[in-house]
Regions:
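Metal-dependent nucleotidyl/phosphoryl-transfer cores and adjacent nucleic-acid-binding surfaces
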Residues: 1-111
Length: 111
């Protein structure tokens, strides 16, 4: 399983629209594997291509909101328990104080 660092750059338009305009990942232990993109869709596509990989964000609470929004607007359903995972679902671990620990997207359930 590969591990990456990841970060989003965002912009706000008219106080009510914020979007990812740039992203970058770097494989931990292989700095030659540096990927960049210009929108959240290309980031999600890259994550899907890197099956079973982990992406570490410096500020998951902020960047993770974009991932969750993307998932909810692209046919994914949030499930609370891993035993309820199906295709196109996601799980989160967020504390009652709003601390984000994990967001896991399941494109297809492992059989």
């Amino acid at each position: 399983m590969k591990k990456f660092t990841a970060d989003f750059e965002t912009s706000t338009w008219k106080d009510d629209e914020t979007w990812v305009w740039a992203w970058a990942t770097c494989e931990i232990g292989n700095e030659e594997n540096l990927q960049i993109g210009n929108d959240i869709d290309s980031f999600i596509d890259y994550c899907k291509k890197e099956k079973n990989s982990t992406f570490y964000f410096h500020n998951l609470k902020f960047d993770g909101e974009f991932i969750i929004y993307w998932a909810l607007t692209h046919g994914f359903k949030h499930v609370e328990k891993k035993q309820d995972v199906e295709d196109n679902t996601f799980t989160t671990l967020i504390s009652d104080m709003g601390q984000f620990y994990t967001i896991t997207l399941y494109y297809s359930k492992r059989k």
